[in-house]
Regions:
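Conserved pre-ATP/AMP-binding loop-to-beta segment of ANL
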Residues: 264, 378-416, 422-423, 446-452
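Structural core segment of the AMP-binding/adenylate-forming
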Residues: 296, 323-390, 499, 697-701
Length: 755
């Protein structure tokens, strides 16, 4: 410092002016800064970006140690949400990487100066040589930063993943490090509109780095098939990234509150045709108010029955139960008193909450009277009369927190199996189960603030509860709840009036809507998602021809909260139920007599806590070793698509050959698309078993079925030995055939000669 002062004094004595002196000092300082930057062990530009991002966006990095585990020639695969993603990548890497940049993007005038500050190579799908150059760079020890989507997202979700990006990883043999960036999508640097995202100037940015993985493609695949397989694997890695980095270590009520904070408390959460719209604030405050009354109905962690239709009141009641630390047991009011009481016994339910107006409108007085002899009936109308202004004010002040704190692994809800094959069992689902399944679905389907869900599936059904209510609530997507899926003329009109973009249903319901609807009623709908039963070809064709919409068929079971597999706009194959969702492991156990496929067992974070059975009331029976036996026989092809062959219990052994009853029913639905049919197997002394087809088709005959099956190339063994015509096939609330009742019809009939 003294030396510098003497030097300045000397220069002034020889006549150097102050401006020139200051300019010289600045030049020396700049040279010193450049020299320090060159000699520093870390990259000064990277450090500068890190300082800016940490200062303005409070950048938080999780799992940074996984970058070191990947080795020197790793491929860093990031989701692409904004123009700042490249700066984020530079700030978290110690080594100077090579950026794979889209060729067209790299040619833009304002991009060129930025690329000069980094090492970048253009990735041009039309020029294989560019891909080979990148493969060579990685093989020689370079770290490659790549955005597999090839463009900034305009949906808010994961977009198309290019095969070329996967080919680099597969050919180079390098480890792929999945990285997710969250927060920047809300800034002005993203390509999402204000309608798609709630804009924030300086949101917190979180970067999550997962464990490195290696692409391993089947050696038998060559050429285009190998390239596509690598692309599908990279998409799987990226969708797993989205799922695993979605918060699920919380309760459903906490997730709804978090959604309200992000999306806005005034945003519409739920809507029904009777009570209108409820904002997140009204929904959460209402739940907190009711929670104070629900605590008196049962002890903490105990089950309370909920018997309500799809309506705002059901959503408020469910969240209120969760806030109170009580477990809502969803009662299927279409199941009849015997099955309902068996369900109450299994779940140790002593109190059922319902609505007096609902009971009157649905004409359930007789059912409620039967239930009241065994369990206590509590009406919401009576509870509301006990709520004071003070209670409402307290709830408003405390609505951001549950009344009784619970953890993610505590029970959140009890659903009951359909009872289509026997006595209903209780299925205990945790908060983590529900939130994980919602996150699994959200990782594959792009939807957001501009969407609106229309849900007619009852909340006592796993599909209706998780996908139709919990998923939109925790995602900030408004949901329109309608109490009956059977109003085929009303539902299309309401979808049209609500401008709904996503519709859930079963084949039975979707077929009814399509027949009754005007061709313009579903003009706003983007996605039609079907589950619970196979989608018939006639239904699929009707929706495509009349509305220009394809039905995305999925598959799930109550025990997995429920979704397991789903066709998506990117990966869709008719005749299958799509590919398994992220986070789900599957194994197939061979079935005697079946040449391909096997009995499906699944494991994952969405698998239930366990069963509750009527012969062991209140005792939880967890799945063995975390694996659930779905009871379904399936095949999974090389590309991961799942095809349902039928229920393991619903195969008949005829003449030593296994025949799927579901396949016979499928043929019947194709032959008589306007009539519902079901097949029952009964003992036969000569051939082991015989098939009885029960159908609503008035003029159905065995000869007509046999001729159609032969024309379709089906086995002669699939022809039923007998056709039984009924006025109305017994069905469950989900629209599926009530197989217990159908079997009862067959067993109780007078045997008639086969037609």
């Amino acid at each position: 410092m003294v030396g510098g002062a003497l030097l300045v004094a000397l220069l002034q004595n020889v006549g150097v002016s102050v401006p020139v002196l200051l300019l010289g000092i600045a030049a020396v300082g700049l040279l010193a800064a450049l020299w320090i930057g060159k000699t520093m062990p870390t990259n000064a530009f990277h450090d500068f970006l890190a300082i800016l991002l940490r200062g303005f966006y409070r950048l938080e990095v999780r799992g940074g140690e996984n970058l070191d585990r990947a080795g020197p020639n790793a491929i860093i695969a990031l989701n692409h949400v904004s123009f700042l993603d490249g700066a984020v990548a530079l700030s978290i890497l110690k080594k100077e990487p090579v950026f794979a940049v889209d060729h067209a993007f790299a040619q833009r005038w304002w991009v060129r100066p930025i690329l000069k500050l980094t090492r970048a190579m253009a990735l041009n799908p039309a020029r294989p040589l560019a891909t080979r150059t990148l493969i060579h760079a990685v093989s020689n020890g370079e770290t490659l930063v790549i955005f597999p989507e090839g463009r900034i997202t305009v949906t808010g979700g994961l977009m198309k993943v290019y095969d070329g990006a996967a080919l680099i990883g597969e050919k180079s043999g390098a480890m792929i490090v999945p990285v997710r960036i969250e927060g920047l999508e809300a800034t002005i640097f993203s390509r999402l509109s204000r309608a798609q995202v709630r804009r924030r100037w300086l949101p917190r940015v979180r970067v999550t780095v997962l464990e490195p993985v290696r692409l391993e493609v089947d050696n038998a695949l060559k050429g285009k098939a190998r390239r596509q397989a690598a692309g599908a694997m990279l998409y799987q890695i990226m969708s797993d990234l989205i799922f695993r980095t979605t918060p699920t270590d919380r309760t459903v009520i906490d997730a709804v509150v978090d959604a309200a904070k992000i999306q806005g408390w005034r945003r519409i959460a739920v809507e029904d045709p009777v009570t209108g719209k409820l904002s997140y604030r009204k929904l959460v405050v209402g739940a907190r108010v009711l929670a104070g009354r629900f605590t008196a109905l049962a002890g903490e962690g105990e089950a309370v029955g909920v018997m309500l239709p799809n309506a705002n009141g059901a959503a408020v009641t469910l969240l209120g139960m969760m806030s109170a630390g009580r477990v809502p047991a969803m009662i299927n009011f279409t199941a009849g008193p015997t099955n309902i009481l068996a369900a109450c016994t299994a779940a140790a339910v002593r109190t059922i909450v319902t609505s007096r107006s609902f009971v009157e409108r649905a004409r359930l007085e007789k059912l409620v009277g039967s239930l009241a002899e065994v369990v206590r009936i509590v009406y919401l109308e009576d509870l509301r009369q006990t709520i004071s202004l003070v209670d409402k004010v307290r709830a408003l002040l405390a609505c951001r927190h549950a009344l009784v704190p619970r953890s993610a692994d505590d029970p959140a809800a009890i659903l009951f199996t359909s009872g289509s094959e026997g006595t209903p069992k209780g299925v205990m689902l945790s908060h983590r189960n529900l939130l994980c399944n919602a996150a699994q679905a959200a990782a594959r389907i792009d939807f957001g603030r501009t969407d609106k869900v229309f849900n007619t599936l009852p909340v006592f059904h796993a599909f209706g509860l998780t996908v139709g209510l919990v998923l939109p609530l925790v995602s900030g997507v408004p949901v329109f709840l309608y109490p009956s899926p059977l109003h085929y003329r009303v539902v299309p009109e309401l979808v049209y009036g609500a401008n709904a973009t996503i519709l859930f249903g079963t084949d039975t319901f979707l077929s009814g809507y399509a027949r009754a609807a005007h061709p313009y009623d579903f003009r706003s709908v983007r996605y039609v998602l079907a589950g619970a039963e196979p989608v018939k070809e006639a239904t699929r064709r009707l929706w495509a021809e009349k509305f220009g919409l394809r039905i995305l068929e999925g598959y799930g079971v109550t025990e997995t909260a429920p979704a397991l597999a789903l066709n998506t706009p990117m990966f869709n194959r008719f005749g299958t139920v799509g590919r398994l969702l992220p986070g789900i492991e599957a194994k197939l156990v061979p079935v005697e007599g079946m040449e391909e496929g096997g009995r499906l067992y699944v494991s994952g974070p969405n698998v239930m806590l366990g069963y509750l059975k009527a012969n062991q009331p209140g005792i939880l029976v967890p799945p063995e070793d975390g694996w659930h036996d779905t009871g379904d026989v399936v095949t999974i092809d090389r590309e991961g698509y799942v095809t349902i062959k039928g229920r393991a219990k619903r195969f008949a052994k005829i003449g030593g050959e296994m025949i799927s009853l579901a396949s016979v029913e499928s043929l019947a639905s194709e032959l008589w698309p306007d009539a519902q049919s079901a097949v029952v197997a009964e003992p036969d002394p000569r051939r082991g078993e015989r098939l009885v087809l029960v159908t609503e088709k008035e003029d159905a005959t065995r000869a007509a079925f046999q001729a159609y099956a032969k024309a379709k190339g089906a086995s002669d063994l699939m022809a039923p030995a007998e056709v039984m015509v009924v006025d109305k096939l017994p069905v469950l609330g989900s629209g599926k055939a009530d197989l217990v009742s159908v079997t009862g019809l067959v067993m109780g009939r007078q045997r008639v000669a086969a037609a």
